[in-house]
């Protein structure tokens, strides 16, 4: 669980850096999903460009915060057998993913290049959560 939390932080850093690069758009989003790039967006509307940039930074911040919460709750609470820490460590990324993921599918932003790393980190997290849950349950018997 902690490893997946750290992976979420890594993805957030990557997301943050891309905002200031020539790529600008999110990882795995290209001309097949968005027909214009950074320069065209900025030329069309500097204020729209600034708004999109601020959203990228906000998402990066929330991804990092989610990863940090999951990692710290897992490392300092779940490892000690606290069920409340397990519940919180699971709830934090589940809430974030439940809000964020569905919006990707109707607009064609569900590419493996865009969501693949999140899917991988989520799979690692789920495996860790199941293993940790079994361990906590055995401790409480």
Regions found by a protein language model. Name each.
Residues 1-7, 59-62, 66, 85-96, ...:
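Hydrophobic alpha-helical transmembrane segments of polytopic
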Residues 1-30:
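N-terminal signal-anchor transmembrane alpha helix
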Residues 12-15, 74, 100-107, 128-132:
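Structural signal for membrane-spanning alpha-helices in multi-pass inner-membrane proteins
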Residues 24-31, 46-66:
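A loop-to-helix transmembrane entry motif
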Residues 31-44:
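Luminal/periplasmic active-site loops of membrane-embedded glycosylation enzymes
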Residues 67-86:
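Juxtamembrane helix-break-helix junctions at the cytosolic face
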Residues 98-118:
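Membrane-helix boundary connector in multi-pass membrane proteins
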Residues 123-141:
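Membrane-water interface at the C-terminal end of transmembrane alpha helices
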